[in-house]
Amino acid sequence: MTIVFWQDNKVHELDRSQSDRSLLDYLRCEAGVKSVKEGCAQGDCGACAVTVVQADPHHGLHIRVVNSCIKPLLSLDQSLVFCASDLPPEHPVVEAMLQSDASQCGFCTPGFVMSLYGAFLEARHKGVACIPDRAAALEVFSGNLCRCTGYVSLIDAALTMDTFSHSDVDWLAPIRSGLAVLDAYVKQKKDPNMISMLGAPGDLPIDPIVDTLREKAEHVDASFVAGATDLGLWLSRKHQRPNGLLDLCRIPQLTVSQHDDQGWRIGAARPLQAVFDEMLVYWPELREYLERFAGRPIRSSASLGGNLASASPIGDCIPLLWAMDARLS
């Protein structure tokens, strides 16, 4: 089995022995991408941020900005990965940054560019305004730090980005093209263990739950992983290597949520940001609490089930779930 993802207009195929290697290390040391930077090596500063896009059979696209310093390669399987250096000079994000003089020493700039790019793609995908006000800009930048404290010009760039977006340009075309190339590559390999992410859950050639349990039985010391925000710290800060990884995000049932008049059912591997976005529709008063919960790139990776399993004292969903009379099943 291999890991396959798309970056810089080409497919990267890696052996699963590199599952626990960080995306940052691979991009800089193997792919020659120098725009991603290592600052804190623990997902706090955002200098290493990249934009990741995956096909989503329920919503079309899953777009998120993640910290490459703590992102294991396994979790990038069948994804598109964009770095700041991948954007053309005429892109609205680049134009807005230039016209706003939003870069000072430049070390953090690629991460801010990627946060803007993720917001830009999400807005184009949903057909809405990109970053309508200062509060929205601060939320987009919640996972980025500027040591020069040049936030005023960065916020200006965020608020003016839409003015540089030409209506006759299809900015999502590279996304569709990349996903098509990736899907064709996976199908051409004809590996039954390579599940095309473009197919609906009912189209999967194997039952991912059964397959994951089989792998666990064969590799009893392997660790289950979803968002990998805790695991990433083991790798980057403690230099520990697990005895194999099993990605729970390849199980569709664990990454979706459903709600009806009987309540809400949330998959354990669903990202916290997706869960919070859904909650805010019904309980907007939760916004202040939820936005204090890590930065957006962490929330976009970390899962609800992982948060409960890790029992972290600095990022705890349990009080909220208690208040909502939640149950585990």
Give a label for each model feature.
Residues 270-300:
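Ligand-binding beta-strand-loop-alpha-helix segment within the catalytic cores
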Residues 66-70, 226, 233-258, 267, ...:
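Structural signature of FAD isoalloxazine-binding scaffolds in flavoprotein oxidoreductases
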Residues 209-219:
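A short acidic-Thr-Gly-centered motif at the start of a beta-strand
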Residues 154, 230-231:
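Alpha-helix capping/helix-boundary segments
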